[in-house]
Amino acid sequence: MQKTAIIAEYNPFHNGHYYQAQTARHETGADVMIAIMSAQFTQRGEPASFDKWKRAKAAVESGAIDLVIELPTQYGVQRADRFASASVSIAEQLRCQTLSFGSESGDIDAILHAARSHVEETPRYKEALKKALQEGHSSAQASSRAFRTVYPSFDLTRPNNILGYHYAKAAKSIQLHTVKRLGADYHDPSLMDVMSATGIRAHYLDIGEVRAVPASTEAMFRTRPMTHWEHYWPVLQFKLRTLPLHTMMELVGIDASLAPRLKQAGVEPSFERALAAVSTRRYTRTAIQRAFVAVLLHWLKDEAPTRFDEVPYVRPLAFNDLGRLALRDVKDDVPLVSKFDARLDFEARVTEAYRLPLQDDALIEHRQRPQFISSK
């Protein structure tokens, strides 16, 4: 059985995702397409526009994806290298022969060459990194700038190139394949048949219209309003105002210099105002959003994984007939979780936080089972 994995957030699943999956299926000769998907919060530290169960169902109902596996929150709300390492680990546990991903370059050889160049070990890179950090750039920005100094032919400032680079560095036994992104740029809200997830969400929030998505995703938008950070601001604001500084510094991603800034942001009238008040060149919006996730979840540093190349369980969220065959193929060798148990305790806490503004009892974690979507 030829299995190709895609690492995704599907926030929401759109026409570009459909194209990527169908192209990957054709070009890699896959019998089964498997998506490893972020849970209730995204890698950049945002509440997913819809819960993981709805997003997984929409992906499988589209016909492009056969099986959706959860990337646990502790591994998914992380910087790019950790996110990539954990996701690749799951793909390799599932014995996927190929990992396919979208990239701005569309050039797999360039990505592989960049990943294998050991740029980070060169004195020139280290000097450029030191200089960028001294100039006040965040560690991620400084790393990208230093990489560009040493290796100018590969643009490591582009979001999908960054992830592709880290997938290549994390891959052990899996082959890599890339599909060049179509249509709008990641941050481009312009209307096209293929729009970015950011553009789709922004357009929906502006005028209430859903564009550039398959019917399965359009149906999801009719179930309830899209979730975003402002829905969580009353709870988050309360926690920012009341958590002692010493407690806040015990949370993931928060140090002694960031904690006071977060507390001060608690006086702001909205999430966007709070985010703008805290963000600096050193503390990017993404880093602050991840810190806000840690505050909302009360995610302690000692609850963070100690390694990211070994995810302790594999949890299916949705699958069709082909996806079920893929699960049967590995059930004797992989720690599959289909019913609630202690391994999901943290994820249950995540979902309780996620559903606060929704008050949707259907989301309670221990009530959920993997969803079978008939292929007929």
From Swiss-Prot:
What are its E.C. numbers? Answer: 6.3.4.-
Q: Which locations, inside or outside the cell, does it occupy?
A: Cytoplasm
Give a yes or no for keyword Cytoplasm in this entry: yes
The record's Gene Ontology cellular component field reads: cytoplasm
SUPFAM superfamilies xrefs: Nucleotidylyl transferase
Q: Provide the residue positions that the database annotates as binding ATP.
A: 7-20, 102, 160, 181
Q: Which GO terms describe its biological process?
A: tRNA modification
Concerning Pfam families, the annotation shows: HIGH_NTase1 (PF05636)
User: GO terms for molecular function, please?
Assistant: ATP binding; ligase activity, forming carbon-nitrogen bonds; tRNA binding
Q: Which keywords annotate this record? A: ATP-binding, Cytoplasm, Ligase, Nucleotide-binding, RNA-binding, tRNA processing, tRNA-binding
Segments traversing the membrane: none
Per its record, the protein catalyses:
cytidine(34) in elongator tRNA(Met) + acetate + ATP = N(4)-acetylcytidine(34) in elongator tRNA(Met) + AMP + diphosphate
Q: Check the record and name the PANTHER family matching this protein.
A: TRNA(MET) CYTIDINE ACETATE LIGASE (PTHR37825:SF1)
Q: What does this protein do?
A: Catalyzes the formation of N(4)-acetylcytidine (ac(4)C) at the wobble position of elongator tRNA(Met), using acetate and ATP as substrates. First activates an acetate ion to form acetyladenylate (Ac-AMP) and then transfers the acetyl group to tRNA to form ac(4)C34.
The record's similarity note reads: Belongs to the TmcAL family.
Q: What is the protein's name according to its record?
A: tRNA(Met) cytidine acetate ligase
Organism for this UniProt entry? Exiguobacterium sp. (strain ATCC BAA-1283 / AT1b)
Q: Which gene encodes it?
A: tmcAL
